[in-house]
């Protein structure tokens, strides 16, 4: 039954939930604080494979840079400076990847379209609200349903299989940092590859590496291809994300050419909203706000999920 005084708009014309509907009361009454305290993890096969591949490719790049190019070098400070720099970029990139993957992107609580919740909203007469028929929640403005996460996500930009998660309101910052650090480490690796090729050609491939010349060439060529591919992809994604933040428009909203019904923020206001606070070095730190949590498995209606 639909409460008077407002209208519930549902594309599939599902009725408003009542107390007798078969939904988990715990999920419908969960607060935003409870949602924020959970470690988020999407059990999607494709996403998990892509996430593991990302880590393996970064580890491979670190192996080639460290053991093929830097350790055999006779220039001590060249090896130390570049080794520290590349490994720092790799650690920051992988840390940003983890934060993006394990952070709730802004999921709307499931099954909150109850009569009690509707009454608590204190809606004005004639005001229209939207309900998602798939996860049975009241959709806030600019929220979209993700078929992979099976949740409505606030300010959903897109679902990225490489981080096995949606990019939304709460984890967009970490995704931006991930793309930035991968792009920087790719540029660094490409520069080192170029210098290594020059050194090997001048030395006639005799003392440029501890590996045989054919293996060295194969490792360097593969790293160059990986670096070019990663740099192109992440640089484009980084630019797209910064453009979206500055224009206060998600990728989904841009593709749908939706007319804004919200007041757009100024460019710097959008950046401060995503990265938190005025410009500082903390914007570059993926560890800000990190809390070590204990993972455990809880069985809930609809399947198991990881939580604390």
Curated annotation (Swiss-Prot):
- Which stretches face the Cytoplasmic side? 1-50, 97-173, 239-308
As its record notes, the protein acts as a catalyst of: L-cysteinyl-[protein] + hexadecanoyl-CoA = S-hexadecanoyl-L-cysteinyl-[protein] + CoA; L-cysteinyl-[protein] + tetradecanoyl-CoA = S-tetradecanoyl-L-cysteinyl-[protein] + CoA; L-cysteinyl-[protein] + octadecanoyl-CoA = S-octadecanoyl-L-cysteinyl-[protein] + CoA
Where do transmembrane segments lie in this chain? 51-71, 76-96, 174-194, 218-238
User: How is the quaternary structure described?
Assistant: Homooligomers. Heterooligomers with ZDHHC3.
Q: How does it sit in the membrane?
A: Multi-pass membrane protein
What does the comment on domains in this protein's record state?
The DHHC domain is required for palmitoyltransferase activity.
Entry GO CC:
Golgi apparatus; Golgi membrane; nucleoplasm
Q: Which GO-annotated molecular functions does the record name?
A: palmitoyltransferase activity; protein-cysteine S-myristoyltransferase activity; protein-cysteine S-palmitoyltransferase activity; protein-cysteine S-stearoyltransferase activity
Q: Which GO terms describe its biological process?
A: androgen receptor signaling pathway; glucose import in response to insulin stimulus; negative regulation of catabolic process; peptidyl-L-cysteine S-palmitoylation; polarized epithelial cell differentiation; positive regulation of D-glucose transmembrane transport; progesterone receptor signaling pathway; protein localization to plasma membrane
Domain DHHC residue range list: 130-180
User: Which PROSITE patterns does this one have?
Assistant: DHHC (PS50216)
Q: Describe PTMs of this protein.
A: Autopalmitoylated.
Q: What happens when the gene is disrupted?
A: Homozygous knockout mice are viable, fertile and do not display overt phenotype. Knockout mice are hyperglycemic, glucose intolerant and develop a type II diabetic syndrome. Zdhhc3 and Zdhhc7 double knockout mice show a perinatally lethal phenotype.
Cite the record's tissue specificity text: Ubiquitously expressed, with highest levels in liver, kidney and brain. Expressed in all brain regions.
Q: What does this protein do?
A: Golgi-localized palmitoyltransferase that catalyzes the addition of palmitate onto various protein substrates and therefore functions in several unrelated biological processes. Has no stringent fatty acid selectivity and in addition to palmitate can also transfer onto target proteins myristate from tetradecanoyl-CoA and stearate from octadecanoyl-CoA. Palmitoylates sex steroid hormone receptors, including ESR1, PGR and AR, thereby regulating their targeting to the plasma membrane and their function in rapid intracellular signaling upon binding of sex hormones.
Q: Which UniProt keywords apply?
A: Acyltransferase, Golgi apparatus, Lipoprotein, Membrane, Palmitate, Transferase, Transmembrane, Transmembrane helix
**Keyword Transferase belongs to the record:** yes
Which Cys-Cys disulphide bridges does the record give? Answer: none
For this entry, the protein name equals Palmitoyltransferase ZDHHC7
Where, subcellularly, is it found?
A: Golgi apparatus membrane
This protein's superkingdom?
Eukaryota
Q: Which InterPro entries match?
A: Palmitoyltrfase_DHHC, PFA4/ZDH16/20/ERF2-like
- Which gene is transcribed and translated to give this protein? Zdhhc7
Q: Which family does it belong to?
A: Belongs to the DHHC palmitoyltransferase family.
Q: Where is the active site?
A: 160
Q: What is its EC number?
A: 2.3.1.225, 2.3.1.-
Lumenal-side positions: 72-75, 195-217
Give the species this sequence originates from: Mus musculus
Q: What is the lineage of its organism?
A: Eukaryota, Metazoa, Chordata, Craniata, Vertebrata
């Amino acid at each position: 039954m639909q409460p008077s005084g407002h209208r519930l708009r549902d594309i599939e014309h599902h009725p408003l939930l009542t107390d007798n509907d078969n939904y988990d009361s715990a999920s419908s009454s969960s607060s935003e604080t409870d949602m924020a305290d959970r470690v988020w993890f999407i059990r999607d096969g494709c996403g998990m494979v892509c996430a593991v591949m990302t880590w393996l490719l970064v580890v491979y790049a670190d192996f080639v840079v460290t053991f093929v190019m830097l350790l055999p070098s006779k220039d001590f400070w060249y090896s130390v400076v570049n080794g520290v720099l590349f490994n720092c970029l790799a650690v920051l990139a992988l840390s940003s990847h983890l934060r993006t993957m394990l952070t709730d992107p802004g999921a709307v609580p499931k099954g909150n379209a109850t009569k009690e919740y509707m009454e608590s909203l204190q809606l004005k007469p004639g005001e229209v609200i939207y309900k998602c028929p798939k996860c049975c929640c009241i959709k806030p403005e600019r929220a979209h349903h993700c078929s992979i996460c099976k949740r409505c996500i606030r300010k959903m930009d897109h679902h990225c299989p490489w981080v096995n998660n949606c990019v939304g309101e709460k984890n967009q910052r970490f995704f931006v940092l991930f793309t930035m650090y991968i792009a920087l480490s790719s540029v660094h690796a490409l520069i080192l590859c170029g210098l290594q090729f020059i050194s090997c050609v001048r030395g006639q491939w005799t003392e440029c590496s501890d590996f045989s010349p054919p293996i060295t060439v194969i490792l360097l060529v593969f790293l160059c291809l990986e670096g070019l591919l990663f740099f192109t992809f992440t640089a484009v994604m980084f630019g797209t994300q910064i453009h979206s933040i500055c224009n206060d428009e998600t990728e989904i909203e841009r593709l749908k050419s939706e007319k804004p019904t919200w007041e757009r923020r100024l460019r710097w206001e959008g950046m401060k909203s995503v990265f938190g606070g005025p410009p500082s070095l903390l914007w570059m730190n993926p560890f800000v706000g990190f809390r070590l949590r204990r993972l455990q498995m809880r069985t809930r209606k609809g399947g198991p999920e990881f939580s604390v």
